[in-house]
């Protein structure tokens, strides 16, 4: 099957690996379990991805590509950054719908060297693009120039991901888990209003 449809085989491996990594982390994930879930010989995993670490890196790389595409479709280029700013509530919904990816980020933070993040160059370019968008918005007078652009981007990331990374605190404060549709709606509305207040 792998030779007839390698892309389908890769897709099954990646889907199984996402479940395994998000549940058990990088160290706890087992190649045998991933292969069994994907219904492939584990040799195919090594053939396509080289190693368990290579598989983890590929999952993050593909997810980053998806988010980069979403950024550009929302207008994520200098001079058209208003669309990205307005997409903040949409990001809350997207994060809530993709809890496994958020768990991957948490496992990465717990198990890897923060000085050497996975796919660092690609991800750094992604956040540099977001920071450039903020600066363009500041030049256009839509975001106050007094704010550091990099801190603005980091704060947006924390505001969106925070409830998913700390679900127990979210539940204690609001009485809702962060994937609850009611919480997602309230959070998206709150962040949209907050951003509008901060913008000039």
Predicted regions and their residues:
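Hydrophobic alpha-helical connector segments
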Residues: 69-103, 149-156
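N-terminal intrinsically disordered/low-complexity leader segments
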Residues: 1-8
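Conserved hydrophobic residue
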Residues: 26-27, 114, 143
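C-terminal peripheral helix-coil segments that are non-catalytic and often amphipathic
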Residues: 93, 97, 127-140, 158-200
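Amphipathic alpha-helical segments used for helix-helix packing
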Residues: 56, 96-117, 166-174
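Amphipathic alpha-helical packing segments from all-alpha helical-bundle domains
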Residues: 65-73, 114-140, 151, 185
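Helix-turn-helix
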Residues: 12, 16, 20-54, 58-59
